[in-house]
């Protein structure tokens, strides 16, 4: 590569370089000792010096210097790892610069001109290799060269970043370099003559955590299946850990959770991922999680600022976030003040005059006649320019539609204010108000546009006056809050509103506030008519999803009158079916029916649909799919929170997995299925405001309230009874309606009544005792535990596959486990470096366990070469192709692990007849095709002669009569012919020749090679004769007379085949015709030679093959990717 020119003085330098060639202005040199075979003392000394100093000359032993005539100062301008690479740079210099330099008279001009050209080449090279995105591109390019030389990965394996650190080996630290690439974590150390290489694929990592040990307070520990590795002494450990966490998360989800995981657009192409992309992804994920925004939102700018908060009459310090469709603000003090401004609600963005009291201010005006003042913005010009551009795009793509909701009083104020045609301050943006909601309903009528609680008044709903008065007080408090803090989605969100939510949202405002807190109101306003179209497209269709929906409709709140008739059930059916049509990746999952039925009680049908979208796609990501990965991740996070927040309970209950399992339904249904409905909706209020944090802290509060009984419980069943009874007796004293029990009410035989817990008290305790968890902490825990959950699914898949395969093969379970790891790694390596192949065709978590990982023909060939005992030299790859075609029953060009192990089991543990049968099948269709690349070459071997006798003499004077032996063996085999599942077709002469070539290849380098060759020559001669006899017997009738004489002279017990075989055959016929030979003939012939029998029946050890395969699997793949093999790469046994 080209180097940034730096002057060096060579007059008194040690002779560390040897000049290879030179010109007037350039010198090409080689590092002394490189390519000399290590025999010379000076070369060995230079090599040792480079190793100790970690010199770049170890990986780039060639260089080109710029020399100006008459000067002792030289400038390195290029280096190379190979002679070919450095020669390409030399040729470029001769062709493009050498003739031009002769024009210059001034030496300084020559140096300046060459240096300028080289710097331009470096800029072009870094642009193409993404190094310009690094903070120090020169150092990154040097590290990239070392990474490629040391680990010899294919070109597709891109380096993301690198760090200097120590890797602990027991109590001994090894100083070296940590390289983080898109698929691997690599470590290299060379100290005192000892070289250490570690290669850990990200998909093998089971834990990634920060720990402390006796020697150091902070280390990064990486846990794989077999080992733990500790890395320490980083300059910035926080940065390193975040990058590692992001790389592990992205790679694991891309390769193991591709069912529902969608990468950010910048990360779609793994080979283009950079350190900055990963840092941006981490910031994006925090931003979307904190404000609970759509996944497609991309953060563009973050800046420190202060926001004028009229309720406190001062400016509040915080940060402003600008994304595709939102302007958001978060105060520096957690929970003090947050604001979410959808750009579709923004009318104008203006810069105000800069003053000492209001430095760098901007004003953001929204349609509800509110304005937000931001000050102290450092890069105000660029921020406002970007905001105006995105505002114009949002208004152009989504013209704003206004809805006027008639309000009877101040308590039912509209979410959006009515407006007429409005022109904003850009002049060229017109916001056209659509027809009102009543007009749209006439155009596309919805059966029941009101919440179901308004349509179905429950019997006995006449509540006591005290409950009604408390409801009125709540409504009054909320209206006062709206006046001071705003009533739209753009309201100021402070600790005061959190307290109001914890007290319980009034039923008349519940649906509307759910829409505001989740920002589903923006989706609703941005997609007029979308839900109606979905309903029209989805209703009447019949599929597996609709059948599941129909089955669960009558299980959704059956005790509520709204779902005891067709009206409520029909609305539920429409919402669930429409969502399944919108998002086929999720479709329909159990528990969605319970959640949707509650949404329909308090929101209109279309509003309930968009609330469901917000919950499934933003607030509970990855929850609703057939593996419920998201819920399991939060379940695992909850288990860790129990250890942190309730240490006494964790100490008494050593196994917290039971409590975590019980809590799974809490997360999936938001307590709706295990708590009385009037109490559970209070939980949903907190969930829509605070997100999953509310469920975590409420779950901890429930466990703390029952900690004493849980500690004294004897088993999991008793713990479940304790929690079920407690949750069933949670009441909502402020609910205006009658109590509705949970789906799983607990019936107690106790004589004493169980104490009742008020939901408001429980929620207040949860906020006071466990409300200190921030969104950033929860997202970090989710990322940490997602690795464990995904690896847990991989372990489950592996165990299930092995459980199916073990009974059907004779390979030992521990060997089968290692074989599975090799099989999976073959699939993974293809995903790493062959992005053009559709990964989804090979890895599908929804398929049966045994079929989740499948490999194609090329991957199979690599594995076959590594683990098969039938090594045939250059013929091995051809044999692997034929075996793959044989195993690919459904012809989808993929095979699963079970088929792979079945053929290996025959090779290693099968009897001789099973092995010969497999070889036979490999040389007839479908395994052998007409276009087989080795089937057209004729077999030319002097051993294949048909003139050999059928009776051979032995050294002691005895003879071997093959005719009698073959006759008896064929009779014995014929008896078992009926037992065979399917009679195999006979083999043609062309196929038989290929069969013989395979046998000759298999015997190569065997200790008994000569005996085997002699034996197979004899057997081949015999089989060729048998085939020719059969050919003549099936030819024209003129041969019949010639065949009668030998039959008459032959003994009575001999049949015509052997009698005819005794005659001297002619040479090969010009055409093969009907020349055939059967499996029985081949097997019987082979059995006559003891050396062949010994070869096929000798015990074979698969363990040594597996050990060798683990060490060389990467090297073979790299070689196949046509990368120059400079040093053998071995995957460490982790």
UniProtKB/Swiss-Prot annotation:
Site (Arginine finger): 551
Keyword Repeat: yes
Entry GO MF terms: GTPase activator activity
One Pfam family named in its UniProt record: RabGAP-TBC
Domain Rab-GAP TBC stretches: 504-691
SUPFAM superfamilies: EF-hand (SSF47473), Ypt/Rab-GAP domain of gyp1p (SSF47923)
Skewed-composition ranges (Polar residues): 455-466
Domain GRAM span(s) in chain numbering: 145-212, 285-353
Chain intervals with Basic and acidic residues compositional bias: 437-447
Entry text on domains: The arginine and glutamine fingers are critical for the GTPase-activating mechanism, they pull out Rab's 'switch 2' glutamine and insert in Rab's active site.
PANTHER family: PROTEIN VASCULAR ASSOCIATED DEATH 1, CHLOROPLASTIC (PTHR47666), TBC1 DOMAIN FAMILY MEMBER 8 ISOFORM X1 (PTHR47666:SF2)
Record protein name field: TBC1 domain family member 8
Source species of the chain: Mus musculus (Mouse)
Gene designation per UniProt: Tbc1d8
